[in-house]
Regions:
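Short S/T/G/P-rich N-terminal loop/turn motif that feeds into the first structured element of a domain
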Residues: 1-73, 84-94
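Short arginine-rich
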Residues: 73-79
Length: 94
């Protein structure tokens, strides 16, 4: 398991469609393929143009496929709503 931070930049007015997919049965099934959804910590920018989430990832390749458009379930949604995304690996420090 790896802690990751994902930042998604959304197109203008796309937030509701993005969240509709992420909370749909299809979106949850796809997310469960790479992340423990019960441990996700989401946040939204005040203008709703950016979404970020701290994730506990168990399949990094599936996460990349979900975000980069190579997953056939998420690709149609991302084509409509996403401008860009960034992924950060989180490390604990003492």
């Amino acid at each position: 398991m790896q802690d990751m931070l994902v930042v998604v930049k959304l197109k203008e007015g796309a937030f509701e469609k993005f969240m509709g997919f992420m909370q749909s049965d299809a979106g949850i099934v796809e997310r469960k393929k790479f992340v423990d959804v019960t441990k996700s910590v989401p946040a939204v920018a005040p203008d709703k143009r950016a979404f970020l989430a701290k994730l506990v990832v168990h399949n990094i390749d599936a996460m990349h496929a979900f975000l980069d458009g190579s997953n056939p379930v998420s690709k149609p949604i991302w084509d409509e709503v996403m401008d860009s995304y960034e992924i950060y690996e989180l490390k604990k420090t003492s």
